[in-house]
C-alpha cells in the first residue's frame, strides 16, 4: 500500500492539506499502540509498525518536495538522497548570485526592507517552481519534474538561509 492509498487520497501532487491532516489524525487514533495494549504480542507489534508507517507517510505527503520525490519514485524515478549534480549552469549561476546578494543584505543601510524584498522574490520563485512541478507531474513528464524538484531544493535551502539571516538581524 502506497502513502496515498494509506490516506485514501488520489496519487497526485496537489493535495487538500486539511483532508490529509484529518485522515492522519483518524489513522493515528485507530492504530495507536495504546489501543492494542491487551492484544497479542504480534498484534501489538503490527500496531507499532502501522503507526510508524502512518507517521512516515504523513511526513512525506505534507511536504511538497518530499511529496514530489515520492510521486517520482512511484513512477520509476528515484531522486531522494541522490548525489547527482545539477546540470543547469544558468540556474547554478543564478543561485550563486542570489546567495551573494543575501550575504550583502545585513551590511546594507536598510537591511529589513532589503531582506523583505529578497524574501518576496525568492518566495515567488519557489511558488512558480511548485506550479511547474505540479503541471509536469500531472502531464507525466517525469524527467522534467525531477530536474525541477532538484532546483526547488536549492530554492528551499535559500529560503532557509533567509530565515537564518532574519534571525541574526532581528533576533
From Swiss-Prot:
Assembly mode: Interacts with HscA and stimulates its ATPase activity.
Claim: Chaperone is one of the keywords in the record: yes
Claim: Chaperone is one of the keywords in the record: yes
Entry GO MF terms: ATPase activator activity; protein-folding chaperone binding
GO BP field: [2Fe-2S] cluster assembly; protein complex oligomerization; protein folding
Family: Belongs to the HscB family.
Protein name: Co-chaperone protein HscB homolog
Function comment: Co-chaperone involved in the maturation of iron-sulfur cluster-containing proteins. Seems to help targeting proteins to be folded toward HscA.
Native organism: Vibrio vulnificus (strain CMCP6)
Record keywords: Chaperone
Domain of life from the UniProt record: Bacteria
Matches recorded under Gene3D superfamilies: DnaJ domain, HscB, C-terminal domain
